[in-house]
């Protein structure tokens, strides 16, 4: 990880231009410095003030347009000076090395004046410029060093000569660098250590880069890090040299041949102390950080256009990334994430994104830990319901960096308009939303939990404050793995447009409650009778004594009248996991909404779908066991 200029930074990574203001006492040579830079020779005649100079991006080392502004006390008012200070990104305070009065004015006038015009928490970076070094045999550094130690906003001090062009280009490079690669957010000179925000950002970067999660960066991980940040690999000897530097200074910076977090942080401290903080900034910006060490909105929320009637899903590359993320943190290889393993995974997040309800939204093991399938299901749910949140989460995990993609938007597939699916009588979607509707206590939550393979005994153990209104799991239809997302819709007289929007409707009534079916019938007539959304009626709690429903016709006759499949008997009160038949039917109806009601009532149609589900569930389990053996 050598200190170098590294990869070209993207436009969003740092400021689009730099504005440098030169101030100082009269006749210290401010204008001469600017004119010497532009003409590359000392001007014989110097005007009272130089016009604003713009240096194009292609001739500056950092490829950023730079504006250089001169200040003349003779030509400008105090108000104009204050305005220039407010517009500047960096200020060069120029003094003459042979003029003690101009040096004294640095602290008695200029620094206080500038600081009065800037916020205490975001001071402008300052460069002290000692001009006319050609006129003396000595250096002013002894006098200037205490000033630099007193004011942390001073980035550096440069002695130069406009007459013989000494350090002129270096002066403006340092000024530009002070804006693009500021020391302030990274390092505290008084404490001689990195600031907490910088340590936090670099720790996240280390954890993302530690792809096998063993607490060190091995040679392969260091080389990958070097390549994505600086566009160049490290030779084996260079890698060893880096580790030797760390070994020389701290005892626990290298372990098992890899760089530890302490070693990683030490290297960056060393870069900053040696004035090579552009190296640390290159790394920070590559991983999405701005000048305040916050992740940028451009990094977390890349542009993703989603037309109406389209949904969002994870693509194959995203699932591979999430599989590797799961494997990285499943340290005991039990195909489930314990609370500690999940906490470790979320250390790269600024907050814990999942609450206890997630454990009742997706599949868990007997300990209540999210399984491999449950982990992928939760990401699928987030992508479908709130794709911006999914992009944010993938950003925290470093998706675009580890997969070397432009952004995490490349992880998302935007499905085509549902109307096209209906016209073509086929769908490319893999996630289907089913709204589960019924009276309170009719058994809707039982249906949701049954999708996760939980019987009534297991459901009774769920705390009220941990309940979820969503459940998602995979279902096999005709040998294809699809995700079925169930949403429990609260009972109300009229449904909102958002509550109607789905691929299939599951209308649930309680066979033991005579008033239960009437609500399903009313909601169907109000919202779904004339729509193209397929509906399935589920007769829940079928293990209880069935009573006659207080409605004009029976549920069976109602289904026949409206050309729907007959009511599906369902119960969670089973010794093993509840039957998955209704979920296969719901997913099939969502996949094939154009299929005629006659086909839906055909036992052969359902047999083909269910047989495919059984075969692929068995195959899936076999592949799962094979995966375990490989791991």
UniProtKB/Swiss-Prot annotation:
Catalytic activity: GTP + H2O = GDP + phosphate + H(+); ATP + H2O = ADP + phosphate + H(+); UTP + H2O = UDP + phosphate + H(+)
Keyword Transmembrane: yes
SUPFAM superfamilies tied to this protein: EF-hand (SSF47473), P-loop containing nucleoside triphosphate hydrolases (SSF52540)
Topology within the bilayer: Single-pass type IV membrane protein
Keywords annotated in UniProt: Acetylation, Calcium, GTP-binding, Hydrolase, Isopeptide bond, Magnesium, Membrane, Metal-binding, Mitochondrion, Mitochondrion outer membrane, Nucleotide-binding, Repeat, Transmembrane, Transmembrane helix, Ubl conjugation
Residue ranges constituting the Miro domain according to the UniProt record: 15-181, 429-592
BP GO annotations: cellular homeostasis; mitochondrial outer membrane permeabilization; mitochondrion organization; mitochondrion transport along microtubule
Binding positions (Ca(2+) 1): 210, 212, 214, 216, 221
Cross-link (Glycyl lysine isopeptide (Lys-Gly) (interchain with G-Cter in ubiquitin)): 166, 248, 585
Modification N6-acetyllysine, positions: 105
Residues holding Mg(2+) 2: 441
InterPro entries: EF-hand-dom_pair, EF_Hand_1_Ca_BS, EF_hand_assoc_1, EF_hand_assoc_2, EF_hand_dom, Miro, Miro-EF-hand_domain, MIRO_dom
Enzyme class: hydrolase
Subunit structure: Homodimer. Interacts with the kinesin-binding proteins TRAK1/OIP106 and TRAK2/GRIF1, forming a link between mitochondria and the trafficking apparatus of the microtubules. Interacts with RAP1GDS1. Interacts with ARMCX1. Found in a complex with KIF5B, OGT, RHOT2 and TRAK1.
Comment field on protein domains: The Miro 2 domain is necessary for efficient ubiquitination by PRKN.
Role this protein plays: Atypical mitochondrial nucleoside-triphosphatase (NTPase) involved in mitochondrial trafficking. Probably involved in control of anterograde transport of mitochondria and their subcellular distribution. Promotes mitochondrial fission during high calcium conditions. Can hydrolyze GTP, ATP and UTP.
Protein name: Mitochondrial Rho GTPase 1
Lineage per the UniProt record: Eukaryota, Metazoa, Chordata, Craniata, Vertebrata
